[in-house]
Amino acid sequence: MEEKTPENEQSKKTFDPKDSMKIEETSTNGSSQPSQPSNIKLSIGSILESSNDNGDPEYSENGMGNMNMNTLPMATSTPMSYTKQPSEAKYPNSVWERKGVSDQEENTSSVKRQKTLPTQSSGEEEAKYSHPGAPTATSADSISMESRPSNLSTSLSKTTSYPQFQVRQFVSPIISIDNSALEPFLNRYPASESLFPVTEYEYTPWLEFPLLYSSIGKFVRVTIDIKWLNAAINPRLCRREIWGTDVYTDDSDIATILAHCGCFSLLKPVRKIAVVDLYILPPLVHYKGTRKNQIESRSWSSRQDGISLKIKEVTWKPACASIFENSIHTLTLEERLQARLELSRSSTFKI
């Protein structure tokens, strides 16, 4: 058994958690002077408190006084705290967690605020279903404030259904064209006399029919070359120089009459020659225009001093190879290009 001496008791002192300022002291050889500690645990708070408690004015002015920093290790680890915190307490460690907590508090406060609002409808809405025979309230009218979304962002994310209106399609009105007054003139001559045309014409954009009053009921024949059935070459196809429907004025363009009646399309190339037979009829009091086959004809309501034209028959024949096309096969490429250049400069292809 060892005897209890004041020196042994002083050497066996431990670190008191209540007093973080005291340092463990050991005495050797009966001396009471403190020796350099080997393992001293200090916190930043204990160093600052010990500096303030010291009554030495020089110690307080110089901050740490004459303390030898080499003898005291730096407190690199987290300060030791002996005050136990409750384990249930949760503190946000980042800015995003703090922001989430604040958003959650705002949502809870808005829900409480909405619960306190009155859920009853106004007098007008109640009167809407009060009279006998009134329709029952829909589910949309009976929705309470509590069932509505509390967060505005979630409500905006939902797609809103808009009423879909029926698209109206434009349909051109049906226009009745009555040309029955001209039927007696079509059967005026027997079939034997109506086999051959009165005269034949070669079509050009500047063709003008003479006044054929003596040939009413008969027909004329017009031959149209391939190049005049092209809207890029024939300027009259783009000017809508056509008056009437089925029965046209004599100053209407013949190529445009064929396109209006659907004999050929302006959107497709034509590779054959058109031979058109046209009835010669008396003038009408009124020529009504319509839109057919991407071409809109014009109307004419005043008096006309010419004749009327109506398509009898349209035949297509293949284009014969010209002398130029037959002789060009024996030429070289340079000679072909030169021949085409000279032909393009001639008056034949000028419009």
From Swiss-Prot:
Main localisation: nucleus
UniProt keyword annotations, A-Z: Chromatin regulator, Nucleus, Repressor, Transcription, Transcription regulation
Record's keyword annotation contains Transcription regulation: yes
Composition bias, Basic and acidic residues: 1-25
Function statement: Component of the RPD3C(L) histone deacetylase complex (HDAC) responsible for the deacetylation of lysine residues on the N-terminal part of the core histones (H2A, H2B, H3 and H4). Histone deacetylation gives a tag for epigenetic repression and plays an important role in transcriptional regulation, cell cycle progression and developmental events.
Quaternary structure annotation from Swiss-Prot or TrEMBL: Component of the RPD3C(L) complex.
Designated name of the protein: Transcriptional regulatory protein rxt3
Organism per entry: Schizosaccharomyces pombe (strain 972 / ATCC 24843)
UniProt lineage: Eukaryota, Fungi, Dikarya, Ascomycota, Taphrinomycotina
Name of the gene: rxt3
